Amino acid sequence: MTNEPLLNRNHKDALFRFIFNNPKDLLSLYNALNGTDYTDVSDLTVTTLEDIVYMSYKNDISFILGSEMSLFEHQSTFNPNMPLRGLFYFSSLYKKYVAENNIDIYSSKRAQIPIPRYIIFYNGRQEMPERCTLRLSDAFVKKSDNYNSNQVTASDTSSNCNSVKFQPAMEITAHMININIGNNAELMEKCRLLHDYAAFIGLIRDYVSQENDINTAVTLAINQAISHNILKEVLSVHTAEVRDMILTEYNEEQHIKNEKNISYDDGFNDGVECGIEQTKIEAIENMIKL
């Protein structure tokens, strides 16, 4: 690979978001996930927060459909902190929803709000199961003797204020779906665009492993995809934008990897220096004892 820095700090859409930002395609993805058959895009209200940025690009899509408020995020690296991020995101979404719908949260009447749903589409290189669930409660620092990890319902009398055991005040559940080629075949079959996205990412990785120059690898991957009718409509019309997105995401991944390597090297060097210093101290102490 070339060592030329290609990091672009302007906020951009991630390729996944760019593809599924179209309400029609987003509706298709939702239908594939849920086994539904919505066709009217006017049923879908996009609620994506425009000021939420991951690294230097935007990888999120949120929307309301029926009684559900869904948050879709794409991740190319596994992040166990997604439920915590989801907590902050949904907090902002609900605050916005309450304001836009003139809901009085101080009223004696119970407010009606959409059901939250959090889906993470993962296509990183780290081996992961086809589907898994991440929970905010997994991150809680300490489970005291009074902590009850069992799920309870609102009607469960053991969850009242006089109970010795207590439930955490909140929980956020994120469902992670592996969209690398070879995973979740049924879902991929139902949503052609998701399948093509996964196939295109696979092509990019293949060419990156073969070529010395990332720009050449991306160009070859785009040409190969178009010739095989993979994301052809998107790639033919938005070639420059797609190339820019891929380079941005690729270099963010490289940036993260480099930072980890730097941290490791710094830690190793600090450890060596501390070891040398400790050896000097022990030598002096031994001389004094003599």
PLM feature spans:
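Elongated, amphipathic alpha-helical interaction scaffolds
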Residues: 1-290
